[in-house]
């Protein structure tokens, strides 16, 4: 039976302009946000790569041989690519925002199970509001059914070589997340349904 290795890239860059300080170094229950996020993944993966500035690297005090650091990029996309290059294992990779510390262990486990079967998955929360699609004039042109609309979150998980290829082919282009790059190249991607609790810390109110 094949034993696949699971790599995880946890992004730890970003300007935190809207937060007012480096949000990853804010504390939740006496732990920084980035450390809280890292500890959620440690039991389930084989390595964790953290693209980050020296400032953030110095503040991560968790001692574990699974954790490795690499240089953060000017953009999230560059940081993820640096993380991919630093991976030791080349089977499957999860990519997660360091500012999403409320990820549930059950969601991590389901993401790993599904990426092994399906090859590319994205964690997302079903829309609770009615969504309107508009044209460039602001005119509403359609209203999709809510059950078909999801807010994309992380982790997003892929076959390592496929997401590496996507980053290399689309280097320098502005994509909002990794799954968008895979979609652009024609890959099929599947949803792992999660809750809205898996929010990204953007403002101070998000810590409540």
Model-inferred region functions:
Residues 9-13, 51, 96, 123-126, ...:
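Short beta-strand segments
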Residues 33-90, 170-171:
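Conserved N-terminal catalytic core of the sugar/cofactor nucleotidyltransferase
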Residues 2-55:
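N-terminal glycine-rich phosphate-binding loop and ensuing alpha1 helix
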Residues 10, 34, 83, 96-97, ...:
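Residue-level signal for inorganic ion chemistry
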Residues 5, 46-48, 92, 119-120, ...:
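Residues at the starts of beta-strands that form the adenosine-phosphate
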Residues 2-4, 149-208:
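Conserved alpha/beta core of the MobA/IspD/sugar-nucleotide pyrophosphorylase nucleotidyltransferase superfamily
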Residues 68-69, 75-136, 153:
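Conserved beta-loop-beta/alpha segment of the NTase-like Rossmann-fold superfamily
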Residues 132-156:
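Short, flexible, basic/aromatic active-site loop/helix in glycosyltransferases
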């Amino acid at each position: 039976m094949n034993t696949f290795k699971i790599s995880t890239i946890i992004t730890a860059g970003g300007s935190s302009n809207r937060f007012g300080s480096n949000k990853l170094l804010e504390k939740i229950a006496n732990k920084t946000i980035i450390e809280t996020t890292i500890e959620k993944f440690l039991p389930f993966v084989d390595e964790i790569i953290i693209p980050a500035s020296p400032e953030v690297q110095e503040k991560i005090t968790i001692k574990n041989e699974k954790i490795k650091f690499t240089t953060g990029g000017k953009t999230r996309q560059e940081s993820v690519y640096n993380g991919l290059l630093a991976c030791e294992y080349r089977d499957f990779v999860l990519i997660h925002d360091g500012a999403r510390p409320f990820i549930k262990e059950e969601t991590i486990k389901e993401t790993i199970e599904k990426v092994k079967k399906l090859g590319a998955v994205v964690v997302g929360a079903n829309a609770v509001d009615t969504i309107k699609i508009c044209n460039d004039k602001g005119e509403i042109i359609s209203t999709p059914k809510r059950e078909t609309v999801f807010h994309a979150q992380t982790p997003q998980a892929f076959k390592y070589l496929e997401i590496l290829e996507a980053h290399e082919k689309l280097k320098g282009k502005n994509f909002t997340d990794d799954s968008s790059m895979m979609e652009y190249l024609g890959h099929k991607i599947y949803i792992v349904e999660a809750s809205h609790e898996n929010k990204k810390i953007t403002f101070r109110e998000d810590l409540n």
